[in-house]
Amino acid sequence: MSYRQMLIHRCDIYHEAAQAPSAGRFGIPADRLQPVISYPDTPDEQDVPCYFTEKTQQLIQEEPDQTVYHSFLVHFPLSADIRVNDKIIWENHKYILKLPKRIRHHHWEVVAVRDESL
């Protein structure tokens, strides 16, 4: 079995876009404020081959409801364009990627995290 055949899942990748705030707030000039982070409506890459392995799952009781914290170790081919803080959508769930690690110039491994209220 080849490595490509192991990548049985497919996900969409959205690269983050940082934009400077349009106006200053609270007496702070706009060029001194943190950039506004957003993601495009259409994916930058579609149907990217990958493989998800569950690492941890926690259900935390918070006000007013529970929050699920879910992390996966995701494998991508070396040709995939993945970056820190990319948003991926897999099986209708949104995950944020942490720091990708290149493994022996062969593939990428990255932790994907989901935290949302139920």
Swiss-Prot record:
<dbReference type="InterPro" id="IPR038667">
    <property type="entry name" value="XkdH-like_sf"/>
</dbReference>
<protein>
    <recommendedName>
        <fullName>Phage-like element PBSX protein XkdH</fullName>
    </recommendedName>
</protein>
<dbReference type="InterPro" id="IPR024556">
    <property type="entry name" value="DUF3599"/>
</dbReference>
<comment type="similarity">
    <text>To B.subtilis YqbH.</text>
</comment>
<dbReference type="Pfam" id="PF12206">
    <property type="entry name" value="DUF3599"/>
</dbReference>
